[in-house]
């Protein structure tokens, strides 16, 4: 079984505006991902999503295809797709990190490290910065989770 990590970004369509809607979607996604043995993190900054998915290559590709076709996403952009031996989000069925709702200290740390506009952290364009943001979000937002 080939394992992979896929990272993409997108912009929320107008259909997803409330945090309650997003949280319900993440809950359903976590259940589906558990079934499909996919793990990952969904980062939200304003109307922008950054998501990492890890798991079986076929399952991850199938899920990305659904996301790409989902009208709740606009401008879906594949950032990285790679085979992996090491999983960084192996215990996370799917977690939502809303950067706007972070406590002051973690939010300030991220705003000092990454570009931001109108209080929203910008999704980086360089792969190493994208991965750094995902790992920072994982560590700062859920430090007790490996």
Which positions does each model-derived feature cover?
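Charge-rich, low-complexity N-terminal segments
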Residues: 1-146
């Amino acid at each position: 079984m080939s394992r992979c990590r896929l990272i993409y970004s997108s912009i929320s369509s107008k259909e997803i505006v409330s945090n309650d809607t997003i949280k319900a979607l993440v809950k359903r996604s976590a259940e589906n991902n558990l079934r499909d043995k996919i793990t990952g993190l969904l980062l939200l900054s304003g109307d922008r999503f950054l998501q990492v998915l890890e798991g079986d290559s076929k399952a991850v590709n199938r899920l990305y295809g659904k996301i790409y076709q989902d009208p709740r996403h606009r401008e879906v952009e594949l950032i990285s797709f790679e085979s992996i031996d090491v999983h960084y989000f192996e215990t996370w069925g799917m977690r939502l990190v809303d950067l706007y709702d972070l406590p002051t200290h973690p939010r300030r740390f991220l705003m000092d490290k990454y570009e931001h506009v109108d209080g929203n952290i910008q999704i980086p364009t360089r792969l190493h910065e994208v991965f750094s943001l995902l790992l920072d979000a994982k560590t700062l937002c859920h430090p007790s989770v490996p």
